[in-house]
């Protein structure tokens, strides 16, 4: 005999207007972008999901930009396109190169304001850029 919760679960799942799926549905598994750091890839199930928003959060000088360079390096190794939106105006081409990034193949935007940053990111995503970094 089904419980009320089980009945509700089935009813909601079958309602096509809601577009629900089961949380362990294989269709929800995404391709990933590797960090290129085996230990980090291991704990993140292979990196960050492609075509999804991912926030890397941490204190000042904690390695956030470095992790983003490693993700971008992985994208470049697969001949993907990188868009880097530098809101901090801290782009350092020499340091990025030392981290493994081919800066000759990075689309760089230093936006004038938040709207400019947003419009650049939206255009990049719409055109099919493989990774967008907002730094």
Ranges and model annotations:
Residues 2-109, 117-126:
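The Walker A/P-loop phosphate-binding site
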Residues 131:
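Hydrophobic "anchor" residues on beta-strands that sit immediately upstream
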């Amino acid at each position: 005999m089904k419980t009320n919760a089980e009945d509700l679960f089935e009813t909601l799942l079958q309602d096509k207007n809601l577009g629900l799926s089961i949380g362990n549905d294989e269709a929800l598994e995404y391709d990933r972008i590797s960090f290129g750091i085996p230990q980090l890839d291991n704990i993140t199930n292979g990196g960050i999901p492609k075509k999804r928003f991912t926030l890397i959060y941490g204190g000042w000088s904690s390695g956030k930009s470095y992790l983003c360079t490693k993700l971008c390096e992985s994208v470049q190794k697969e001949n993907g396109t990188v868009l880097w939106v530098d809101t901090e105006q801290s782009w350092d081409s020499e340091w990025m190169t030392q981290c493994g990034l081919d800066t000759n193949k990075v689309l760089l935007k230093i936006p004038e304001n938040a709207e400019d940053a947003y419009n650049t990111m939206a255009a990049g995503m719409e055109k099919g850029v493989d990774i967008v970094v907002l730094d």
